C-alpha cells in the first residue's frame, strides 16, 4: 500500500517550515563519539586497507585523535526515492523497477530498504523492511516536487547501530515543491543519511543542479548524471557499493566546544586520494 508522506509527517513539515533543523541534529553518535562515513577513492576505485593512523580528522580546525575505523560491518538502511512524474515512459518504469530489484538482490539479510515515490505528492510505496523489496510503478503523476521529496528522504531518526543511505533519482526539474532548495541544503547539514542524487536524464536548471550538488556534498554523497534509465541499475549498484565500502571513522571531539555547529574535514595522510565525507555536524545546546 502506498502511504502519502504528508499524512504522517505533518509535524516534521511544520518543523521544517519553522527552520527546525537547528533545533535538533539527527547526526549519528553515541554519547560523545562522533561517527563520520568517509569514502576514499583513487580514480574511480575504492581504496581499502586503511587504518586509523592513515586518517587526519579536524573538528572546527582542531586535529582529533581517531578511535578506530571500520568497513562493511554495520547493517544499512537504504531509502530509494524515485521521481514518477509524467516524463517517465513505460519502458523507463520497467528499467526503474529492474534497478530497484537489483538493489534488493545486493542487500544483505541484515540490511533494510524502503521505496519512496514522488510527483506533486510524496508517498512511501514500500515501508522499511528487510529484503527482498519491490515497487509498483503503475501510476505516474504530472508535477515534480523534487525538494519536498528530498526533505522527506533526509528526515529519519538517527540509528547508532545502522548506517543510513539515500538513493535519490530525478530529472531535477522541480515544478511543484512547497519548500525550496535552501531548506533542503540546511536539512542535509543535520541529517544522518549520506545522499547520492542520480539525475536521469538531467533536465535540472543550473540553480537546481547546484542545490542538489550542495545537498549531496553536505552529507558526503555525490551527484551522478546519466543519459538514460538504461544506465540506472549500474549507477544504483555502484553508489551503494561505494557507500558500503566507505570507512566509518570514530572520534571523541577534543579541544572544541561541545555544542553548536562543528565543521569537519577529513584527509588521508599518506596520499592525495579523492575523499567524500560529511562536512560537519550539530550538537544541540
Give the label of every model feature segment:
Residues 7-17:
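Bacterial N-terminal signal peptides
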Residues 1-4:
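Positively charged n-region of N-terminal signal peptides that target proteins for export
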Residues 21-285:
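Scaffold/interface architecture of coatomer-like assemblies
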